[in-house]
Amino acid sequence: MTWLAKLKLDYTRESERCVARYLHNGPLRILQSLYPEGDAVYHNVLVHPPGGLVGGDTLDMQVTVGAGAHGLVTTPGATRFYRSEAGLATQQVHARVEAGARLEWLPLEAIAYNQCDALNRAVFDLAPGAEMITWDITALGLPAADLPFAQGTFRQHLEVSGTWLERATLSATDDRLMNSPLGLAGQRCMGTLVFATGSAIAPERTERALACARDLLEASPLRLQAGATSPHPQVLLVRVLSPVTEPTLALLRQVWAGWRQAMWALPGNVPRLWNL
């Protein structure tokens, strides 16, 4: 039996309060809605009760953030792509962020289990004046549990429409990619943090954000496996590799908090779910 689960999530600003309305079909839904920062920023926890995907399963999320609204979405656990006997397992999100709106799309990691056949796809459309922060964290197997990613394929698609596109196909049997110094160098977790806008970022903001990120990277044990750059006038990136998930996640959380303060003058208070 395969699952097709859909969620439509719409944020709007009503007076000084951000509100959200959502519809779901199948096992994909909003578990909690919180205002830990006051009425202007709406935090949501997205859950998929089955806990993982196999061949033929699809999770489809459609998100709209209306003008002036600010939504933050996270998850209570990893997205697990299990062994696929037939067909592709797909998780996809398409988000539209309108002028003056902000979106923080911060799911926990995606785990590629041995013999998975998976696609993790995220597309973001940003209107002029819109801004967002997202990350993509991928764990290849579970090295600490001696469950390596020895066979299978994991596909990634991360796109800011008209601005930036990254696509990758990670084959477990591609030794040059998985283990060479020009590839993952034997690391089994990789993370990308993105700050993107619908208009060019002012040079002083870019410099401030990169300085913030680089200071944090330099102080990290992962400093030789991480970097910060601006590949496009509307995009800032931090990339990091680590042997397991926790160091990458911890470092990206630090930079996320720093960018929140530097770019939006908002505190980097983590969603309370992350402290459980």
Regions found by a protein language model. Give the residues of each.
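Intrinsic-disorder/low-complexity, polar/charged segments enriched in Ser/Thr/Lys/Arg/Asp/Glu/Gln
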Residues: 58-60, 119, 190, 235
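N-terminal, charged/glycine-rich beta-strand/loop interface patches
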Residues: 1-109, 114, 121, 261
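Short, surface-exposed recognition loops or helix-turn segments adjacent to catalytic cores
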Residues: 108-110, 135-140
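Short, hydrophobic/aromatic beta-strand segments
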Residues: 73, 132-136
